[in-house]
Design a protein with these regions (language model features):
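Conserved alpha/beta-hydrolase "acid-adjacent" motif
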Residues: 132-141
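Catalytic active-site module of serine/aspartate enzymes centered on a nucleophile-bearing elbow/loop
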Residues: 149-190
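Glycine-rich nucleophile elbow surrounding the catalytic serine of serine-hydrolase chemistry
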Residues: 4-19
C-alpha cells in the first residue's frame, strides 16, 4: 500500500512505528512485544482454550463465547457480550497468540521492536482497569520499556474498562482522550 506521508496509526502491529511507518501511534490495550513478559493468571485463563489445544500453533482457532466474555467484555452486560462476540469473533491463526505470549522463544522475533528507537513517532499506550487479556500491569510494563526511547511515550489507564474498551458504554471518553492527545502533537497533517 502506497502512502504519500506518514499517518497516525492504531492497531495490533508491534513494529509499524519502529520502522518509521506513521507519524503517531495509539496502542489500545496493546499486546506485549518481545522483552515484556505478558503471562499471568488472568492472561492464561483468558487464552487457555487456545494454548492447551493440541497443535494450535499451526491451526486456525476459534475463541469460545465464555473465553471472549472473560478476555474482552468481562464488564459488559451479557446482551452486549453476545452482540460483540457475534460481530467480531472469527477464526484466527493460533500462531499470533503464541507469538505474543511466548515472544522470547520465537526464533523469528515477530514481535521484536527497538525500545530505544529515538526516531520513533509519538506513542500513546492505554490500559483498561479490568482488562483480563492485557492487564494494566502488563500495559504499564510495556510503557516502561517504550520509555527507554527519548521519543514521546504516554500512558493512560481507563477506569472501569475491559479489554474491548472502544466498544464499551462511554467509549466516547476513550475516543476524546485519544483525539485530544493526537491534537496536542506537533504532527504535520499531510
Amino acid at each position: 500500500m502506497f502512502m504519500p506521508a506518514p499517518r497516525e496509526r492504531g492497531g495490533s502491529c508491534f513494529w509499524l512505528l519502529d520502522r518509521g511507518l506513521g507519524s503517531a501511534g495509539v496502542a489500545l490495550n496493546s499486546a506485549a512485544p518481545e522483552g515484556v513478559f505478558p503471562l499471568d493468571w488472568s492472561v492464561l485463563k483468558a487464552t487457555h482454550g487456545i494454548f492447551f489445544k493440541w497443535m494450535a500453533w499451526d491451526q486456525v482457532v476459534h475463541m469460545s463465547f465464555p473465553e471472549f466474555q472473560y478476555a474482552f467484555t468481562n464488564t459488559f452486560p451479557e446482551e452486549e457480550q453476545k452482540k460483540y462476540y457475534d460481530r467480531y469473533v472469527v477464526p484466527e491463526t493460533g500462531r499470533i497468540y503464541f507469538q505474543a505470549a511466548f515472544a522470547q522463544l520465537d526464533p523469528h522475533h515477530a514481535t521484536r521492536v527497538n525500545f530505544k528507537n529515538n526516531e520513533r513517532a509519538p506513542l500513546l499506550l492505554t490500559a483498561g482497569e479490568f482488562d483480563h487479556l492485557i492487564p494494566p500491569h502488563v500495559a504499564r510494563s510495556n510503557y516502561e520499556h517504550y520509555k527507554q526511547s527519548t521519543a514521546r511515550t504516554d500512558f493512560q489507564e481507563f477506569k472501569g474498562r475491559a479489554h474491548l474498551l472502544i466498544a464499551q458504554k462511554g467509549w466516547e471518553e476513550v475516543a476524546d482522550y485519544v483525539a485530544n492527545w493526537l491534537e496536542q502533537l506537533p504532527i504535520q497533517k499531510g
